[in-house]
Curated annotation (Swiss-Prot):
[2Fe-2S] cluster binds at residues 69, 71, 88, 91. Keywords: 2Fe-2S, Aromatic hydrocarbons catabolism, Dioxygenase, Iron, Iron-sulfur, Metal-binding, NAD, Oxidoreductase. It is an enzyme of class 1 (oxidoreductase). This dioxygenase system consists of two proteins: an oxygenase and an oxygenase reductase. Binds 1 [2Fe-2S] cluster. Binds 1 Fe cation. Its cofactor is [2Fe-2S] cluster; Fe cation. PROSITE patterns: RIESKE (PS51296), RING_HYDROXYL_ALPHA (PS00570). Pfam families: LigXa_C (PF19301), Rieske (PF00355). Its EC number is 1.14.-.-. Fe cation binds at residues 180, 185. This is 3-chlorobenzoate-3,4-dioxygenase oxygenase subunit. SUPFAM superfamilies: Bet v1-like, ISP domain. It comes from Comamonas testosteroni.
């Protein structure tokens, strides 16, 4: 079955596509700063379907440009990183981080050809341990998003990257689909095994009420179940344009994080997980009452393949379709790890990538639990069509400060307080 136009337009991100145009309005996380050694080898970088090369000069300046030399199309990945730019090893032409040809030793100076040659390049900034790229056309650049976690001291922020073999929207929707948590991640857990003061005891109630609304920057949801003494336990999360998810991994007072689901191309995504390391909140992988580890639940033990230099060679997980995502059927059979896959990131990876690189939305039978997914698709499509029709800027492009206040997490509130008011009361005064 052919994909619908909406389905296609939501996931295709190459230059000239509707979503590609919308994404290019924003600053995009491209790679970790540590991936670029000063004076070291260039890095192949696939971003929104464009083949780029990134490098760091000996002085520390970063450049991101088209991977092809404008002379004969040779790969600039093979080039020499020098002070002042990247030199093609074919004919010695050298390009600055601004894309100018600054040296052309194979052509006589009197021919005055050097100044007429440029390589396509993109503006870059570094923040929170990440190199950011702006791929749009504006002469006055937008500001970087002022997400709370990005404004903490860099030594208090951990950045995790992870590549997935599926489109960006599929991965984002996995983040905002909270109904899977009680099954995929903790389906083998019994509430009476969890410490009395740990919120995972509420996961025994596997069918919460879901409440969703649009926000200035995207959408948000609250998933609620009854708690003790006329209280409600709430898990609250956000989608923020264009590809950000703020998820409820800890108590809202301590949960300072953000995940970006950055399209490498139409069928591959790079996750950037920014996490505050100073959180004192109880972790999801807190030991059980017995002292035993929580079965199958870990947030940090991600196993990677060794990075290579090819276009898809960065931050690939060890588990993939070729080895059935390392599923352990015996572990699954005894029920302690519901999925048979160890680790939260690996579990999510298996589910999302097993759908295929681009799922046909026409084959889905969405349930009331999928309200956040439905509303988020509509929200994105609305912004996409307005941008496509008349260039209307999507949310947040020129409102960088608005990203600072949203917070995700879980919390208890009196049943008498409505969900929107309860959230506003809980985040009041929290932002660091």
């Amino acid at each position: 079955m052919a994909l619908t136009k909406d389905n296609e337009d939501l996931v295709r991100v190459g230059r000239g596509t509707p979503m590609g145009g919308l994404m290019r309005e924003y600053w995009i996380p491209a790679l970790k700063s540590t991936e670029l050694e000063a004076g070291g080898s260039p890095v192949r970088l696939l971003l929104l379907g464009e083949k780029l090369v990134a490098f760091r000069e000996p002085s520390g300046a970063v450049g991101v440009m088209d991977s092809r030399c404008p002379h004969r199309g040779v790969s600039l990945f093979m080039g020499r990183v020098e002070e002042g730019g990247l030199r093609c090893v074919y004919h010695g032409w050298k390009f600055s981080a601004e894309g100018k040809c600054v040296d052309m030793p194979s052509v006589r100076p009197e021919d005055e050809f050097k100044n007429s040659v440029r390589v396509a390049r993109y503006p870059v900034k570094e923040m929170a341990g990440v190199v950011w790229v702006y791929m749009g056309t504006r002469k006055v650049l937008p500001e970087l998003p002022r997400l709370e976690v990005l404004n903490l001291p860099e030594n208090e922020v951990d950045v995790i990257c992870l590549q997935r073999k599926s489109n960006w929207l599929q991965n984002l929707e996995g983040e905002i689909d909270t109904s899977h948590f009680n099954f995929l991640h903790v389906g083998g857990l019994h509430a009476d095994e969890v410490p009395d003061d740990h919120p995972l005891k509420y996961t025994a109630q596997v069918a919460p009420q879901y409440l969703v609304k649009e926000t200035a920057l995207g959408t948000c949801y609250a998933a609620q179940v009854p708690a003790e003494e006329d209280h409600t336990y709430t898990r609250f999360a956000h989608f923020l344009f264009p590809f950000w998810a703020l998820i409820p991994q800890a108590d809202i007072a301590q949960n300072i994080l953000a995940r970006a689901w950055v399209p490498m191309d139409d069928e591959h995504t790079m996750m950037f997980f920014f996490r505050w390391t100073g959180s004192k909140a109880k972790r999801l992988d807190t030991p059980l009452k017995s002292g035993s580890p929580m079965p199958g639940v870990t947030l940090t033990d991600m196993k990677y393949k060794e990075n290579t230099t090819d276009w898809y060679g960065r931050w690939q997980p060890l588990g993939d379709e070729s080895n059935d995502w390392l599923i352990d059927r015996d572990l699954q059979k005894v029920g302690r790890v519901f999925s048979g896959i160890y680790g939260i990131h690996a579990q999510d990876q298996a589910m999302t990538d097993s759908m295929g690189p681009i799922i046909d939305h026409g084959l889905e039978q969405l349930a009331p639990t999928d309200l956040m997914i439905v509303r988020t698709r509509r929200r994105i499509l609305k912004a996409l069509r307005a941008h496509e029709a008349n260039g209307t800027l999507p949310p947040g492009v020129d409102e960088a400060d608005q990203y600072f206040t949203p917070r995700s997490g879980y919390y208890l509130t009196p049943k008498s307080v409505d969900w929107e008011t309860a959230y506003e009361q809980r985040i009041e005064g929290l932002v660091r």
